[in-house]
Each structure stands twice: as C-alpha cells, then as structure tokens.
Amino acid sequence: MNDIGRIIAAACLVAALLFPAADARAQTDARQAWSAASGSIFEVEPTWPGYQKPGFGAPAGTAPEGTGIAILRPGLLVTAAHVVSKATEVHVRTPDGTRLVATVLAIDQKTDVAFLPVGIETTPIALAQERPETGAPVCALSNAFGLGIGITCGVVSASRRTGVGFNHTEDFIQTDASVNPGSSGGALIDLEGRLVGLLSAIFTKDSDSDIGVNFAVSTELMLESLPQNFR
C-alpha cells in the first residue's frame, strides 16, 4: 500500500470510530432534552367559526391544531397568536392526555404570541438565560400535524433574524429543526431542555411544510408580550 492509500485508510478508520460516537451522543442529548421539557408541552385545539378543513384527527369544524408551553407559573401557557386569534373556543390536551378548556388571556398580534390560563397545576419549562449561538444544537417539541407531541432536532441557523416579514415586530431564532403545521406555539429548546424560543413560522414558497428554514420568537420578545400583572 502506498502512502496515499495508507492516509485514506487511516482517515476511514478515524471516521468509523468517531462518527458513531458523535451520533450516539446526539441521540443521548435529544433524549435528555425530551425528558427535561416534554412535561411542559401541551397540544392546543382551537375551534374556528366556519372552518371546513380540520387538521388530521381533529373533529369537524375545528381548526388545525397547535402547541402550547407551560411557562413561568403554574396554570399559564403560551402559544402562537395565529393558532388562537380566530378561535371561538380553545381546548388543550395535557401531557397525560387530559383535555381541558382554556381561555385566552392576551394576544399580541405584533409578535405572534398569546397566553392561555388553564385550570390545573402545570410544570413551567425552564428558560435559557442566554440566546443560543449560531450553530448551537437545538430541538423542537411540538404537535406537528396534530399527531401529538414529538421532537425533532437541528441547529441554530441564525441566532437573530429580523425583517423576515411574518410579524410586525420580529426577533427570531432561525433553525433547521423540522417544523410543520401544528408546530406553531411549540418549544425550541437547548439540549438541557431550556426554552430558547416559541415556534412561530415556516419559510416556504410552495406549501406549508418544512424545508429547513424555520423561525422561533425569542424568549426575550415572548416575555415582553406578557401582561404586566403576570411578569
């Protein structure tokens, strides 16, 4: 074997040894993130007047489902405003499957954030103290297509995006973690399970499906939208 052949063989051996270990670590981190945060994630089931095209598994007359996050204090959820802004009523489904009526406390259309009190004790999600850096690993916990809460993972594609054109006031974290209809209002978390953003928008020109350019409202902007008496 010549020198080039030896170099190639050595490189292949290193890749074989390192990549499975890296993949295993990523899977472990995702499991840890899920374990830390999933107990704070709710399915949101709005009913919109005159809606004729229910989401997967939704009763006739209801709108496509969304997601909500327990935050700050027991009994308070946050979701995307566009999930509930047209709703005549809103139900949520807890992590253990209990279905409850929720009320809409406040809607901030400028930031696409809404707050929902629910009549039970909830486990608020931990909040990240710092904005994640570009390239940092993150996971999205959401109710994609109304199928129930699940997890997808990726990286922060950009730590701060403004002027995208979805909302009047924007402070987005961009990610390639998979996001789809039903994910709105879900949690973008770090690998410790701490909230870094509220899933809000999918950038696509052809259909409402994931192409890897997705946006979450930063926790800083989300908290600015909270009514004063709840801060």
Language-model-detected regions and their locations in the chain:
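Bacterial N-terminal signal peptides
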Residues: A9-P20
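Gly/Ser-enriched beta-turn/beta-hairpin loop segments
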Residues: K53-G61, L105-D112, S159-I173, K205-S209, ...
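Conserved active-site neighborhood of the chymotrypsin/trypsin-like protease fold
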Residues: P49-G50, E65, L72-I149, L223, ...
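Catalytic nucleophile loop of clan PA
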Residues: I69, S178-L199
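Sec/Tat signal peptide C-region and signal peptidase I cleavage site
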Residues: A22-A26
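C-terminal cap/linker of serine protease catalytic domains
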Residues: Q27-A36, V44, W48, A140, ...
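Flexible, gly/ser-rich surface segments that form the specificity/activation loops bordering the active-site cleft
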Residues: D29-A33, V83, P124-E130, T134-E170, ...
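Bacterial N-terminal signal peptides that target proteins for export
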Residues: M1-A11
